[in-house]
Amino acid sequence: MTELIKVDEKRYAEPIILDNNIILPGQEETVRLSAGRLPSDNRLYIYAHVYRSVNPGPTVLMMGGVHGDEINGVMVARNMIEEKVFEKLNRGTVISVPLLNVFGFINFSREVPDGKDINRSFPGTMAGSLLQE
C-alpha cells in the first residue's frame, strides 16, 4: 500500500537558503558551494541545482559522485539537468548535486584526502575534518 506524504503547506512556502542564496517556490537556481581547497590554495566547488514547484510536495535530494570512482550517478544527474527533466516539476522540490566528492573524482577514489568515505560521514560537523565540514 502506498502512503501519501503530508506536506506542511505553510512551511513549504518558506525559502530554501543555501550559502546565502534564497530559493522560493516556483524558482530554480544553481548554487555554487565551497568544497575545500587544493594544496595550491585554489578553492574547489560543488554545484547544487535547485528546482522548486509552486505547489507543495516532498523534497528529493539527488547526489552523484559520493564515491569518486563511481561515475554513473554523476552522468545520470548531469543528463537529467541537461534534458531539463526537473523544469516542469508539478509539486515539491528537487535538489540535484551531480558531483559531491570532487577530491575522489579527481583521484578516481572512494575517499577524500583524509582517507574517509563520505557515505559513512553524514551528517558531519563544521568543526570536523575536511570530510565532516
Name each region found by the language model.
Residues M1-E133:
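Structured catalytic-domain cores with a bias toward divalent-metal coordination
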